[in-house]
């Protein structure tokens, strides 16, 4: 069981199998989950609901994770520290600098369910 049960999580993932696996894993561990298939859907959900953590694929067609993050920074700045990027590729070394030096957690695939849950708990435990 996670340290922080009942966390409200928005999963933004264009790959259906990955999105469903994240949804299942997080729900199985006691969290509330909404899913979006792209950045535009995510922005609509952000306008309607409150979230503790946003898990976003970094590389998506259309609005990618970086664009979504910038929109979150402008529209919901209190949520920017709650974003976690999920990616199969390693970000380039200048990646953190693009966000003003703020450490944006990156969960690199493949990862274990335990690692996923630990990253979420770490984000929620941060004093933001």
Spans of model-derived segments:
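Acidic catalytic/metal-coordinating carboxylates
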Residues: 38-41, 64-70
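Active-site residues of response regulator receiver
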Residues: 57
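Non-catalytic signal-transmission and effector/linker regions of two-component phosphorelay proteins
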Residues: 1-8, 101, 112-128
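Acidic, metal-coordinating helix/loop segments flanking the phosphotransfer/catalytic sites
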Residues: 35-53
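Conserved acidic carboxylate
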Residues: 13
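Two-component/phosphorelay signaling modules centered on CheY-like receiver
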Residues: 16-34, 104
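Receiver (REC) domain active-site loop signature in two-component systems and cognate sites
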Residues: 60
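Hydrophobic/aromatic residues positioned on beta-strands within the core alpha/beta folds
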Residues: 84-87
């Amino acid at each position: 069981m996670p340290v922080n049960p009942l966390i409200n999580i928005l999963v933004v993932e264009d790959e259906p199998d990955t999105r469903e696996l994240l949804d299942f894993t997080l729900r199985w561990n006691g969290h509330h989950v909404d899913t979006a298939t792209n950045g535009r859907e995510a922005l609509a959900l952000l306008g309607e609901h409150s979230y503790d953590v946003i898990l976003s694929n970094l590389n998506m067609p259309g609005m990618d994770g970086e664009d979504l993050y910038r929109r979150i920074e402008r529209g919901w700045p209190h949520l920017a520290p709650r974003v976690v990027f999920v990616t199969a590729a390693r970000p380039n070394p200048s990646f953190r600098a693009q966000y003003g030096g703020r450490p944006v957690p990156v969960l690199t695939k493949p990862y274990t369910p335990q690692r996923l849950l630990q990253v979420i708990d770490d984000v929620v435990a941060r004093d933001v």
